[in-house]
């Protein structure tokens, strides 16, 4: 007669065996699941883009948000009467809402303030002063009623010395009847105060393209003076959302031309504002660029 285990002993053996099998399967599944997940997480942490965005949205397009990269543009008041001299006061605050007071000097200034109406008219390039408490202030006149966009373009310096370039944007309002001006047609030549300015180069989507500006005064070539660390300064704004494109200038003249490297993020129309200095006076030539 064959020996048989008691029923209770058999049940206990089955339970223990099931537990052991579950543990072994769980260990194997855990090894399979944890390996790739850990590797992916490490790759994201180590290989992610550590360059802070200039604002929000596409790479190279800034000024679309009031907060980005842990910094916030905080106006201290913002009521303006069209055509009346006023003052714009603001702070750049960190993630803890503390005013930032350490900025790197970029293009000869710690902060550049660009102001333009939403129809891309009335361009102003200003350089505010900062008080010890981190409050920036600058005289500002909004000449026409409407909604205006103010851009703060700066590079903050963190406690460990890291430099964080950011461009933030905020709307300012001058109450009154707003009549938008149509954007001028695309043209490679503009005239300002007797100077004729033209540019060469055909910006393409996603490609760094050289763009060169030449200034003429009648039949002569005026002597361009250094301005903001180069021989000219270029701001490019996108029609529609007023995205602010970052442009890299060449510090030296290319013959008699002022050269920049420009990348456009997509099709549409853009407004180019080229600042140049002659005989101590800064002027701005404006162009419309159409990208198919």
Protein language model features and the residues they cover:
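Extracytoplasmic/periplasmic copper-protein system
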Residues: 2-3, 28-80, 155-205, 209-216, ...
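N-terminal Sec-pathway targeting helices
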Residues: 4-18
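Hydrophobic membrane-insertion alpha-helices, especially the h-region
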Residues: 14-28
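The feature marks the first
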Residues: 68-132, 140
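Beta-strand-rich structural segments
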Residues: 85-98, 150-152, 207-220
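Aromatic sugar-binding surface patches on proteins
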Residues: 122, 131-137, 253-259
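Residue-level recognition of secondary-structure-to-loop junctions
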Residues: 130, 137-144, 264-266, 276
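Exposed beta-strand face motif in extracellular beta-rich ectodomains
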Residues: 146-150, 268-272
């Amino acid at each position: 007669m064959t020996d048989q285990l008691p029923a209770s002993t058999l049940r206990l053996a089955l339970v223990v065996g099931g537990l052991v099998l579950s543990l072994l399967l769980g260990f194997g599944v855990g090894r399979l699941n944890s390996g790739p997940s850990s590797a992916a997480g490490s790759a994201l942490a180590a290989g992610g883009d550590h360059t802070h965005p200039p604002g929000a949205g596409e790479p190279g397009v800034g000024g679309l948000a009031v907060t980005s990269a842990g910094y916030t543009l905080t106006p201290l008041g913002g009521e303006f009467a069209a055509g009346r001299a006023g003052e714009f006061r603001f702070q750049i605050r960190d993630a803890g809402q503390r005013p930032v007071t350490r900025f790197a000097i970029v293009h000869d200034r710690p902060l550049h303030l660009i102001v333009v109406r939403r129809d891309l008219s009335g361009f102003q390039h200003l350089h505010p002063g900062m008080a010890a408490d981190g409050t920036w202030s600058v005289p500002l006149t909004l000449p026409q009623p409407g909604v205006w966009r103010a851009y703060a373009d700066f590079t903050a310096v963190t406690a460990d010395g890291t430099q964080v370039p950011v461009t933030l944007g905020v709307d300012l309002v001058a109450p009154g009847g707003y009549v938008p001006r149509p954007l001028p047609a695309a043209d490679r030549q503009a005239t300002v105060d007797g100077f004729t300015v033209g540019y060469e180069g055909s910006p393409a989507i996603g490609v760094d393209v050289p763009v060169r500006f030449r200034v003429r005064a009648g039949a002569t070539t005026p002597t361009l003076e250094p301005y903001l660390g180069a021989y000219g300064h270029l701001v490019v704004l996108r029609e529609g959302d007023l995205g602010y494109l970052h442009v890299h200038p060449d510090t030296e003249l290319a013959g008699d031309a002022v050269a920049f490297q420009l990348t456009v993020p997509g099709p549409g129309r853009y407004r180019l504002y080229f600042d140049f200095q002659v005989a101590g006076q800064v002027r701005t030539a404006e162009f419309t660029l159409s990208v198919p």
